[in-house]
Structures are given as C-alpha cells and as structure tokens.
Design a protein with these regions (language model features):
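A compositional/biophysical signature of low hydrophobicity enriched in polar/charged and small residues
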Residues: 1-337
C-alpha cells in the first residue's frame, strides 16, 4: 500500500527518540498519529524496503561493550572496487566509504572485543595486501542522537558525551544487546518476539531496555534512518590537528554545533596528525561546506591544520554489530529456559 509522504516523515522523524517501550508500541504510535496500527507497520515496512529506515533499535554508548575501530587504506585507483568489495564482505564492517584523499577507503570494523577487531583487521590486510590505519576512539563528544529530517540538522540540544561511567554489558545481557543492534521485528508485539528468542518474559525485555536507557548504556532507542536515501546524499568527514591538552575543550564545543552529526577524538597515525573528527551531512556539497566553515569558526578551530574528506561512494552502511557473535547464545538461553 502507498503511504502518504507526511505520514512517512512523521514515522521516521518523530520516533528517533522516545519510542514507546510498551507491549504494543506501534499501536501507541498509531494513536498519536490518529491512524491505524496497520498503517504504521506498513509505513515502517515500506521505509525498510526503500532503504530510508535502517532499523528500529538502539545506539549503544562507547562504554557498553564490544569494540570498534576506524580503519583507513590508501588503495590504488585501479584496485578500489576490488578492495572495497573485500572490505564490505567482512561481517564486522558496518560502514565502508570511498573518500576524496590519498587514503581513500574508510571503514569501521566492529567486534565483541578489541582482540577480535584486531584479528579481523589483520585478515583484511592479508587479503588485500595493503596496510590499514587503526584510528581508535579516545573520546566520543557526540554519537548518534538522531537527525531532524525537517530541518536537516542533528536532533535535540546537544548533550556532551563524557567517558562512559557504566560497566560494560556482560553474560546474559549480550543476546538482547545483539537483538537491539539488529532491530525490532515489524509485528504488533515486537518485544514478545524478542522474548521468545531469549527465553525471557516480554515485561523483562521492555524493562531491561528502559534500564539501559536510564543508566546510559543505550544512548537512544528508536528509529535509525539512512541519510542518503532521504536526500542527504552529501557528507564530509572533517579532521583537525589539535594539541592534546586542548582537544577536549574544542571537541565539546564542536559537538554542540547544529549540523554536526558525529564528533570524536581519535588516535593519530604515522603521517596522519589529526585527532579531532566531525561528520556533517547535507543535501549538497555547498550546504556541507557552509556548515563546516561555521562550526570550525564557532569551535575556535580556525588556523588549526584540517582536511575535509567528502565521500564519493558508499559501499556499505549497516548498523553497528558489536554484539553479533552472541546470537548463538539466544538458542541456548531459550532452551535452558
């Protein structure tokens, strides 16, 4: 069935935060929109099919567990498609982009722990015959807090991300974390569907998700959109070289600027002096450049060495799967229960 564009916008925009943690969340959304539950489910199914919806699930904090690293390779132009395909085929890779730079292939490798991530990086190097930078996160200043589709800016007043104070998820929590990364099934009682896979009660699943939101393990739970499919098909990663004793101050101001979707401090690499990163998305390059100039000035970063790396090709974009290796545990939990 065809979904009215206004309804689709509401479904994708309004429940990036505050998604109903109830037995029948889609019915609650239907009441708020004055439509029927079937229209809500059909709307989300259509958005999933056309790629504008990545999933309805959670974004975990940096300290919740698992591991990830930003990787980068300098790939000869004649090998770019070949190497990009090898990188994208790795299950741990959730983002893989070509960018305008000598180091032209940028990807995120995820895994259950740092050792597994490093093993996967070494395997990629062996398969491609190319070295890869490991640019580890030191501190997140802004992670995925959602994106206002009406105004094309990052959502909500900025909440600066400090180092995680919560303990990492462990043991019996990990299968649920894996499902949260995967996303809710589009059925009337999605948490009940999860509960059957986990051997938990529906009430306990909902309560646990709420607890993780309150204690900071989850930064948000709700609709996760894909910018490109919604018309925001220009993006650039801007990197700055900032003295280590001042990077946190600049990073926090940078992260607070409208239009900045992600902001991190990362480790440097030989020949790569940059330690502060910001992502900006927009409908065209001029709009992105304008935001970059504005936020650079606002954060006091004018005069610092910087580079702007526009993306040219998106090879892969999926949700992070730091807990994906724990799917097998779901069966054992359910059987034991």
């Amino acid at each position: 069935m065809d979904i009215h564009p206004h309804l689709k916008l509401r479904l994708l925009n309004d429940w990036q935060h505050d998604f109903p943690l109830k037995a029948q969340p889609f019915a609650s959304i239907a009441v708020a929109l004055r439509v029927c539950e079937e229209d809500v489910l059909a709307g989300y199914a259509g958005a999933l099919a056309d790629g504008s919806l990545s999933r309805i699930g959670g974004v975990f904090s940096h300290g919740a567990g698992g591991a990830a690293v930003l990787g980068a390779m300098a790939v000869p132009d004649h090998r770019l498609e070949e190497v990009a395909a090898i990188v994208s085929a790795c299950p741990g890779v959730n983002h893989n982009y070509a960018r305008e730079h000598r180091v032209n292939l940028w990807f995120v490798m995820t895994g259950p722990d740092r050792q597994q991530v490093e093993a996967s990086m070494q395997q990629l190097e062996q398969r491609t015959g190319l070295p890869a930078w490991r640019l580890h996160m030191v501190r997140p200043y802004r992670i995925d807090l959602g994106f206002d589709l009406r105004h094309a800016v990052s959502r909500r007043p900025m909440r600066v991300s400090h180092p995680a104070a919560t303990e990492p998820l462990q043991g019996q929590d990990l299968p649920l974390a894996s499902l949260i990364e995967e996303g809710l099934p589009l059925v009337p009682r999605p948490f009940a569907a999860w509960s059957r896979r986990l051997g938990m009660t529906e009430t306990d699943v909902i309560r646990t998700v709420g607890d993780w939101l309150r204690n900071g393990r989850l930064k948000r739970f709700g609709v996760v959109v894909r910018h490109h499919e919604l018309g925001f098909d220009a993006n650039a990663m801007t990197v700055y070289d900032v003295p280590d004793d001042r990077v946190d101050a600049h990073g926090q101001i940078l992260a607070a600027q409208p239009g900045v979707t992600l902001a991190y401090r990362r480790t440097r690499a030989p020949g790569w002096p940059f330690n502060l990163y910001a992502m900006v998305h927009g409908t065209n390059r001029d709009a992105v450049r304008s935001v970059i100039e504005r936020v650079t000035d606002a954060a006091g970063l004018v005069g610092h060495d910087r580079q702007v790396l526009f993306s040219t090709t998106r090879y892969k974009q999926t949700g992070g799967r730091r807990f994906r290796d724990h799917h097998a545990q779901e069966v054992s939990h359910a059987v034991a229960g």
